[in-house]
Amino acid sequence: MNAPGERLGLPQIGKARPFALAMIIDAVGSGLFLPFSLLYFHYAVGLSLTEAGLGLTISMLIAVPTPLAAGVLVDRVGPRTVAVATNAARVAGFLGYLLVHDLTALIAVALLISVSDRLFWVAQPALIGEFATSGSRDRWFGLTVALRAVGLGIGGLLAGLAVSSLGIVGYHALVVANAVSFALAAVLIASLQVPRRASVAGLAKPGPKGFRAVLADRPFCWIVASNVVFGIARTMILVGFPVYAIQVLGAPAWLAGVLYAVYTALLAVAQTSLVRRLEHHRRTRALMLSALLWAGSFVLLAVAPLLPRQAIVAYLSAVTVLYTGAVMVHAGVIDALVIEAAPDTLRGRYVGGFNLSWAAANALAPGLFTTLLGWYAGLPWIALTALLLLALVGVRRAEPRLAWQAVHVRSDQPSGMLS
């Protein structure tokens, strides 16, 4: 690899260029629509904000178990096939949004997209595990985080321009553009060259099969349980920061957007370089570090009401940097740990089982935060700090029992693709 690429912590892209392009196109498309999804259904479709939020929530809740089925599907037909099919389904879903006129139709179409999203987010890590060498997987996952941050930022900027200049037509244009982005991503992923898959029968080992094997892997289950807490912590930039900053600390409304911009910019600029620095350390120790960084940022938030109001903007900006550091450390190792912990024949099931931790975190975070906030302003951050310390203990307990390659980065291997 050239020196600049090595310093930046980039993998050798090589024949995986279609995958990298697909990821950034996917992210740009998502950035076009996600920030304006509720507003689209309100202004362009005519639903109330309550109906739009209810429809999207119902569809996402119904789709929660999807990762389990996705894991089986990925193991049977391969992650590339699943990734292509789910992007095609997303195209159909977003074009279907143009035909939505009531709550029932919204739930039906949103369910197709929610299921497709969860299928894709099981297939994508498994696909990286299939085409990338063991020593390069951390870098590939770091690159996907950075590309997604860049793409979401670009998409959000373009979406704001489209809506402000085109009005209702702009909202429809966002939906069509997102559908086109998924179509392009499907074509690019279909063109990706991956090693020929060995037959499952030929690689099967004695012992529990299917999801029973995942459940029997107790150290891995400790990681999954700990990641529920990490997942809740990762949602706080959207779920907790804006409400706490504006309603509790009296910060100006524009600060929430600025803090999220700082968060996104740091992910885009620093994620891959940080992954390179983490390669010489155990992945489990990096997870423990992320727990401590998150805990530190939440303690600072808990005591923020004691500060003078004029110091809040600078203070929250500094806390956001610390919080983002925790996110980057966690994101830099967690997916590679899951892939390396999984036997090749059960990779999809391991990723699917692990993705339930994200589903649980996303479901729990809003209610947990608002309930605790209603009791006492600092209680959400105190409770999360305690949970993070428990998660740290869980990771520490799992560390000596995890597979060696799940804990250690095999940096002796080239940071490129399998052939």
Language-model features and meaning:
Residues 1-16, 192-229, 412-419:
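Juxtamembrane intracellular "pre-TM" segments in multi-pass secondary transporters
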Residues 81-96, 179, 285-301:
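Structural signature of the two symmetry-related core transmembrane helices
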Residues 160, 180-199, 394-398:
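C-terminal membrane-cytosol helix-exit motif in multi-pass small-molecule transporters
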Residues 64-101:
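Conserved MFS/SLC helix-loop-helix module at the cytosolic interface between two early adjacent transmembrane helices
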Residues 65-78, 163, 269-284, 373:
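Helix-to-loop junctions at the C-terminal end of transmembrane segments
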Residues 109-148:
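Cytoplasmic helix-loop-helix junction between adjacent transmembrane helices
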Residues 285-331:
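C-terminal transmembrane helical hairpin of 12-TM major facilitator-type secondary transporters
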Residues 6-61, 219-263:
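Helix-loop boundary and gating motifs at the non-cytosolic
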